[in-house]
């Protein structure tokens, strides 16, 4: 590990250190109080636009579960397990590519252009799916949708009023997944109803295209292209109660970060190198991308994509309606996550949920042992009784703890990265998501056939358990810390103990400040 702690050159060290101090130690950041002021209706329009983008993301990742159940032989034949995996995983593969392209192009061409492109891809993909009469056509349609999903994941939402928009992003994704299951259940008895399920995905994309003309480009993007006056106008429209000083402070805060990136002149390969040769950066990347991989490889996406297939295999008459319970659980417990995460802390939530996810998957594996399923995943006897109910209950418990913990927290880890490598670090985080997603979606049914359902779910239980071990040793709590503090944490190894002491100091400082305020009153 010693080699990881050496910078590429002393001169680079000096320049980089000066710029870090300028950004991370800037008093402007401490005076950036504008976000404590009231947001305008205009800001909520921006938030709504972001929510529609998240809804698109959620709907198109959720609807495949129903489509797989009701495709029948409409594509010229009944799909086998490998063909179902292809149709499903190709979307994640497209999202992997879309996330890379969107991440690299966002600064140069702006967020709005990226969102427009994503919407067009959603619409084209939906049309291709609706018109599909072969597996090849359906695969192309799902791949095009995947490109749109990856774009949406990278560029929606913009970082304007952070908490409201980020919260709406998480909730809109799970809302899209819940609605997709509802639409699937509604068209379950309609002839070729899966085509209607697919075309509904184009509706929010059209709505988003109609909303975008009323939304400005992000202030950061405007500053990036030397349009400071326009950026100030946008900030004033978002925060109407802010005074001129607060607007200028916000503008200067954004300008510092933009100019830092320009002065560093950091190429893609330079950032990738810094993430791998600088020890603190590498550990931050390992912790962030590792949690993301665990969140995807632990089995949630096998449930999201294949719940209809699973519940049909264990004997439920209306598998998509039953799957709606899973989507509703995900939606409800995402709310709980948003309530708890800043109060309890991410590390504590992860430590309390990952082992319970493993326990729930283990229970599902045990229940599957008592359900007679053929190697082709067809139920042999309808007398499944308690075991089928046990599978459903175990999955509900798993999804509940997943949504409270790793499912949402994994996306929050981008703040581990220092400013000079955050752009590429965040892109790698998204790539970890979609790369792991491809692995799960392209192997789940094969696992079920080759090592039995019990073996597949036991495997996912083991991944969640090893994830718990990884969090215990490698995932520090950075709640309330500055960028400089977070950098210091990862300079102390993975800094779990160091971060714990920092949290004690922050808590003591907060109590002292509160007591001083009370005495003044």
Regions found by a protein language model. Give the residues of each.
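Alpha-helical transmembrane bundle of multi-pass membrane proteins
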Residues: 1-239, 259-521
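Short intracellular "coupling" helices and adjacent cytoplasmic loop segments at the cytosolic face
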Residues: 237-250
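Cytosol/matrix-facing amphipathic helices and coiled-coil assembly/linker segments
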Residues: 247-260
